[in-house]
């Protein structure tokens, strides 16, 4: 790291190193702000010097706080959201701070307490929160063909089974209990196939969808539940995954705003999100995503039947 400490040294670091360190600094800036009495649990979105690509100190007094829930490594989670929050910060002309939460319960509490202004939510989490606090649903992700998302039950490529019924006596990894794609919908899919939780040899509650995919690949579980975007992320790793069953097409995870932000700010954020077109920015969070489209509360009412 001497290239960072010695400004007179003319030999620049390789581009890959220079780019990969930015999300780490994104994370460290957040940790520093927490230590200095800033809002707890957030990454500070830096402003950028285009010549050096290194973050400069940002005034957080005007910052928006964007929350998301995952049990992923904080640096990996930061890498996923960093491109979008950087673009939003530039479009809005104000910093956007990332607030990572461990699970959906923590995220819901942060929104209700006003500790988060914007958030990416699972559909059922959105419905639950909509009943408890004032929210505006802004946008939802779509793929190139206009579809949203799917809940997937996946197995390893070398697993011979072809149907959900063949999971009887086998193990399955599920995600967060409030997760639409890695818990609630997969349970429904199994019920519809005539398979109860009691028919399975074991059911692991692994928190994140990444954990579900990884534990199927390493053989800890025969099957795992996840969204189609997480499936695509892990599909070709190691021995590979394949889809045993998938749900109907479902609206993707919405981005929402607290109504207290005010109509003008909410409209600015919505327009900024709708204008995001860079595939690298979109796919960093959700592989296969083509764009954001306007979302309406009614898009998610169908999920009431899954509660």
At which residue positions do the language-model features occur?
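Short helices/loops that flank or line small-molecule/ion binding pockets
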Residues: 105-119, 132-133, 165, 209-225
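N-terminal hydrophobic or amphipathic helices and topogenic motifs
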Residues: 2-5, 9-17, 26-106, 112, ...
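Beta->alpha turn/N-cap motifs
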Residues: 65-70, 81, 100-104, 114-132, ...
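Periplasmic-binding protein-like
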Residues: 65, 69-70, 144-155, 236-279, ...
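Bilobed "Venus flytrap"/periplasmic-binding protein-like clamshell domains
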Residues: 66-89, 101, 124, 147-214, ...
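A ligand-binding cleft/hinge motif common to bilobed small-molecule-binding domains
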Residues: 123-132, 189-192, 214-241
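Stable alpha-helical elements in mature extracytoplasmic
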Residues: 80-84, 103, 107, 122-125, ...
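Solvent-exposed coil/turn segments that connect beta secondary-structure elements
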Residues: 71, 121-125, 143, 156-159, ...
């Amino acid at each position: 790291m001497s290239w960072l400490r010695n400004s007179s040294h003319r030999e620049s670091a390789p581009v890959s190193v220079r780019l990969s360190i930015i999300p780490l600094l994104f994370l460290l800036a957040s940790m520093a702000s927490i230590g200095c009495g800033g809002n707890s649990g957030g990454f500070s979105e830096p402003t950028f010097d285009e010549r050096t690509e290194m973050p400069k100190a940002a005034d957080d007094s005007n910052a928006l706080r964007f929350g998301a829930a995952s049990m992923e490594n904080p640096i990996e989670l930061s890498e996923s959201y960093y491109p979008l929050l950087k673009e939003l910060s530039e479009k809005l002309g104000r910093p956007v701070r990332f607030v990572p939460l461990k699970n959906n319960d923590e995220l819901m509490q942060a929104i209700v307490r006003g500790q988060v202004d914007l958030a990416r939510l699972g559909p059922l989490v959105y419905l639950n929160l909509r009943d408890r606090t004032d929210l505006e649903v802004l946008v939802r992700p779509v793929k190139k063909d206009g579809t949203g998302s799917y809940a997937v039950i996946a197995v390893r490529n070398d697993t011979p089974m072809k149907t959900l019924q063949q999971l009887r006596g086998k193990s399955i990894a599920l995600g967060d209990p409030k997760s639409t794609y890695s818990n609630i919908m997969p349970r429904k899919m199994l019920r519809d196939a005539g398979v109860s939780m009691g028919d399975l040899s074991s059911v692991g509650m692994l928190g994140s969808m990444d954990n579900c995919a990884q534990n199927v690949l390493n053989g800890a579980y025969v099957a795992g539940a996840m969204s189609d975007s997480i499936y695509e992320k892990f599909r070709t790793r190691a021995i590979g995954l394949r889809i045993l069953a998938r749900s109907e097409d479902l609206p993707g995870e919405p981005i929402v705003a607290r109504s207290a932000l005010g109509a003008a700010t909410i409209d600015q954020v919505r327009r900024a999100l709708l204008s995001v077109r860079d595939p690298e920015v979109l796919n960093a969070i959700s592989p296969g995503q083509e764009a954001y489209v306007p979302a309406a509360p009614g898009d998610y009412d169908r999920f009431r039947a899954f509660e």
